[in-house]
A protein has these predicted regions:
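Glycine-rich, basic loop-to-helix element that forms the pyrophosphate-binding segment
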Residues: 64-81, 102
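Short aromatic/hydrophobic "clamp" motif used to bind/position activated sugar donors
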Residues: 86
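Conserved nucleotide-sugar donor-binding catalytic segment
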Residues: 79, 132, 136-214, 218
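Acidic helix N-cap motif at the loop->helix transition within catalytic regions
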Residues: 17-20, 45-53, 94, 98
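N-proximal low-complexity "stem/linker" segments adjacent to membrane-targeting elements
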Residues: 1-27
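The conserved acidic donor/metal-binding loop of glycosyltransferases
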Residues: 90-94, 118
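Conserved donor NDP-sugar-binding/catalytic core segment of glycosyltransferases
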Residues: 98-129
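A conserved acidic beta->alpha catalytic loop
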Residues: 25, 32, 40-49, 66-68, ...
Length: 256
């Protein structure tokens, strides 16, 4: 482990259209002590060529031998991480230039081992959607099981405090699964830095008539298969998540 180093976990799959802008947002950081760990999950587009165009020794590209999904891809990157701090950035999202500097200062100043920030949303062409996302100032274990308030692209934690995090091969909500692993440590809390330091890209998806059912099942699988909760408890948490998801949109998402 290297003191002060931030290991940035970036899974990629067919994001050649976006990944250059994402990587550039990392290069533009005012905090320069980082390593960007890109694990490509057998992309069939030009992702490799785009990544190779960046001549920066801090950028490290790895490849899965077969298409494995985001959970195992993140696990791979986490095993390669050498940093004191672990951060996450998907290959189509963007950081503001001060993201790492301000977040590390916030954590060091307050003695926090886990934090997250505010962010806004953009569309596929990087145009603002005028949606600003915040969250509770403090998230404890109880609140984390109610709903995942933490944006994956904003989260940072201390590797010294939590060690190596690995999750089960779950297809949906694998970012939530990482946080549930962190919250297994007694007394864990996540703290909000009230500053917009990231931009989340909303990409078009096909509309499904059974969207609610699929979302409910993905949460049930998260709590039952990944977090190993009994079926009844997993079903309860899945229901609670549906309710608090609506509350989160009302309370913490603002049209600007």
């Amino acid at each position: 482990m290297t003191d002060g180093l931030v290991s940035i976990i970036m899974p990629s799959w067919n994001t050649g259209r976006y990944i250059a802008e994402t990587i550039q947002s990392v290069i533009n950081q005012t905090y320069g002590n980082w390593e960007l760990l890109i694990v490509d999950d057998c992309s069939t587009d030009n992702t490799d060529l785009v990544v190779a165009s960046f001549k920066d020794s801090r950028i490290k590209l790895f490849h899965n031998k077969k298409n494995s999904g985001a959970a195992l891809t993140r696990n791979y990157a986490l095993r390669k991480a050498q940093g004191e701090w672990i951060a996450f950035l998907d290959s189509d999202d963007i950081w503001m230039p001060q993201k790492l500097e301000h977040q590390i200062d916030f954590m060091k100043k307050n003695g926090y081992s886990l934090s997250f920030t505010e962010y806004d949303k953009i569309d596929e062409e990087s145009n603002p959607l005028n949606i600003y996302v915040s969250g509770p100032e403090k998230v404890n274990r109880h609140r984390m099981y109610n709903y995942d308030y933490i944006g994956q692209l904003t989260m940072m934690y201390s590797a010294k405090e939590f060690g190596l995090i690995q999750i089960k091969d779950i297809k949906k909500n694998n970012d939530y699964a990482i946080r549930l692993q962190l919250f297994k440590k007694p007394g864990t809390c996540a703290y909000l830095l009230k500053e917009k330091l990231a931009r989340y890209r909303v990409r078009k998806v096909s509309i499904s008539h059974d969207k609610f059912r699929k979302k409910f099942k993905s949460h049930y699988d998260l709590f039952h298969l990944c977090d190993e909760k009994p079926a009844v408890i997993a079903m309860w948490y899945a229901c609670v998540n549906m309710i608090f998801g609506l509350i989160k949109k009302i309370r913490y998402e603002t049209k600007t």
